[in-house]
């Protein structure tokens, strides 16, 4: 079935969301990322899969990890990489994102990695793109961040094995506003995770059906019991300004991951965080830097995953 991101043969033509991506496609991407992760962290030389292909990182929001990761991934595949900076571009003169895309297409750019503050913005750009152009959603609004979801799944596979059927995964924090949480939820369901628990203040839990089938609660200590993996979400400080969280201190008291709390989970529970970490809010230093932390592994895996996605779409 042809969709916005799948062609009539079920092959990816864009990566906009993990929702609706077939299990076989997810597994192929994860397997490929696993195969090339040594190259992704610099231990193998540059490849030429995308030699002569122009890729643009089209970011309308600030980013460090994601943008750098995509840049390295495209570079290591041999692509010509163009970094678009909205703060110095014609968008400041009123040019639309669509016109920016079409002008860059006219220059021969074939791949676009897009981050945008608005929900659905990347999907709208994909609809405007010409034949043979591929778009990758690097995060739009609160909708989706598919490559973050993929790198989280790769990290879980490395820490816990490829069979997710018995995994108990806890997602903690501001799920309501998190595009990472939505992508993780879609991926975990598709890969058959045994139990998905979602925990956070009532004001930060969504009510739009995304949590269907999850175990939902506000008691973090209870949710930790026997957990195999913890996905800690960044608390945006504007949530406190909006009155959704009384204070950072109270949030940490109720939902911060400390060494003592971590002991309630499985003895080898993996700790993930998409970054940037608010140390002392979501996670203490000793947990973030401890033996069970997978945070830097996530960062390294991000390059491998993005190489696999770029290779699949443009190779």
Swiss-Prot record:
Keywords from the named record: Pyrimidine biosynthesis, Transferase
Binding positions (L-aspartate): 93, 179, 234
Purpose: Catalyzes the condensation of carbamoyl phosphate and aspartate to form carbamoyl aspartate and inorganic phosphate, the committed step in the de novo pyrimidine nucleotide biosynthesis pathway.
Which PROSITE patterns does this one have?
Answer: CARBAMOYLTRANSFERASE
Pathway recorded for this protein: Pyrimidine metabolism; UMP biosynthesis via de novo pathway; (S)-dihydroorotate from bicarbonate: step 2/3
One GO biological process term is:
'de novo' pyrimidine nucleobase biosynthetic process
InterPro entries reported in the protein's UniProt record = Asp/Orn_carbamoyltranf_P-bd, Asp/Orn_carbamoylTrfase, Asp/Orn_carbamoylTrfase_sf, Asp_carbamoyltransf, Asp_carbamoyltransf_Asp/Orn-bd
Supply the Pfam families for this chain.
OTCace, OTCace_N
The GO cellular component terms are:
cytosol
Give the source species. Xanthomonas oryzae pv. oryzae (strain KACC10331 / KXO85)
Q: What's the family?
A: Belongs to the aspartate/ornithine carbamoyltransferase superfamily. ATCase family.
Subunit: Heterododecamer (2C3:3R2) of six catalytic PyrB chains organized as two trimers (C3), and six regulatory PyrI chains organized as three dimers (R2).
Its Enzyme Commission number(s) read 2.1.3.2
- Binding-site list for carbamoyl phosphate: 65-66, 115, 145, 148, 275-276
User: Which gene holds the coding sequence for this protein?
Assistant: pyrB
What name is this protein filed under?
Answer: Aspartate carbamoyltransferase catalytic subunit
> Which GO molecular function entries does the Swiss-Prot or TrEMBL record give?
amino acid binding; aspartate carbamoyltransferase activity
The UniProt catalytic activity note for this protein reads: carbamoyl phosphate + L-aspartate = N-carbamoyl-L-aspartate + phosphate + H(+)
């Amino acid at each position: 079935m042809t969709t916005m991101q799948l062609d009539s043969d079920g092959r990816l033509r864009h990566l906009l969301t993990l929702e609706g991506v077939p299990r076989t496609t997810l597994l192929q991407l994860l397997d490929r990322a696993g195969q090339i992760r040594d190259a992704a962290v610099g231990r193998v030389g540059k490849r030429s899969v995308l030699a002569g292909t122009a890729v643009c990182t089209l970011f309308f929001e600030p980013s460090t990890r994601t943008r750098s990761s995509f840049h390295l991934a495209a570079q290591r595949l041999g692509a010509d990489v163009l970094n678009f900076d909205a703060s110095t571009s014609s968008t400041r003169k009123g040019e639309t994102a669509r016109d920016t895309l079409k002008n860059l297409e006219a220059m021969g750019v074939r791949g676009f990695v897009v981050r945008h503050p608005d929900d659905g913005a990347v999907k709208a750009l994909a609809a405007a793109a010409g034949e043979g152009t591929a778009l990758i959603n690097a995060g739009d609004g609160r909708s989706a961040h598919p490559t973050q979801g993929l790198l989280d799944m790769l990290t879980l596979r490395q820490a816990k094995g490829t069979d997710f059927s018995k995994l108990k995964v806890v997602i903690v924090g501001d799920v309501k506003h998190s595009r990472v949480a939505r992508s993780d939820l879609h991926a975990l369901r598709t890969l058959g995770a045994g139990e998905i628990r979602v925990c956070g203040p009532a004001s930060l839990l969504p009510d739009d059906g995304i949590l269907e089938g999850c175990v939902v609660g506000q008691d973090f200590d209870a949710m930790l019991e026997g957990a195999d993996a913890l996905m800690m979400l960044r608390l945006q400080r504007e949530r406190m300004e909006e009155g959704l969280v009384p204070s950072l201190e109270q949030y940490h008291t109720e939902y911060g991951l400390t060494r003592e709390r971590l002991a309630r989970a499985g003895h080898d529970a993996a700790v993930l965080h998409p970054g940037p970490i608010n140390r002392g809010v979501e996670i203490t230093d000793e947990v973030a830097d401890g033996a069970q932390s997978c945070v830097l592994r996530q960062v390294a895996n991000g390059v491998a995953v993005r190489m696999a996605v770029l290779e699949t779409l443009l190779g």
